[in-house]
Amino acid sequence: METTNAKTKITVQTTVNSPVSKVWESFNAPEHIMKWNQASKDWHCPASENDLRTGGRFKHTMAAKDGSFSFDFEGEYINVIENKLIKYVLGDGRTVQVKFEGSGNQTHVIEVFDAETSNTMELQQTGWQAILDNFKGYTEAA
């Protein structure tokens, strides 16, 4: 974690044993997002919309499987470079950058996001890393 301009940045990352084109597709196609986008097995992503282009918007519904709670994770893309970079701003003004570094049949995915103030840094990092780990497992198995 690093602090820049009074905003704390948190980094999560993984290496996926798949080529960058497959990783990009799994990361961005709604039919894939709904299968991997949860931090734990008692949550799921029942809906996903994604207009992947600079100026486009996305919305992923995150919900407890028991129906007790749900929220929409949404924002607007401010930079999209196919197979390389996604940068977006969330509804609360925080920014997220996702880099894809492909090398043969492996792709390193690095997410850097502005921390929010409601949860501890450790909880945020753990939650985002769990989702990224689910993404890795799903993409490698597909």
PLM regions: where:
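Hydrophobic/aromatic beta-strand elements that line small-molecule binding cavities or substrate pockets
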Residues: 14, 47-50, 73-78, 95-102
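Glycine-centered tight beta-turn/hairpin loop motif at sheet-sheet or coil-to-beta transitions
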Residues: 7, 68, 91-93
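A short, structured loop/turn motif at beta-sheet edges
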Residues: 20-21, 52-53, 78-83, 99-108
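Short amphipathic alpha-helical signal-transduction/dimerization elements
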Residues: 28, 132-140
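Beta-strand/loop substructures that line and gate deep hydrophobic ligand-binding cavities in soluble
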Residues: 85-131, 135
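Hydrophobic pocket/interface hotspot
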Residues: 23-24, 33, 58-60, 77, ...
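Short beta-edge strand/loop motif at the mouth of beta-sheet-based domains
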Residues: 11-12, 31-68
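Hydrophobic ligand-binding cavity/cleft-lining segments
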Residues: 1-43
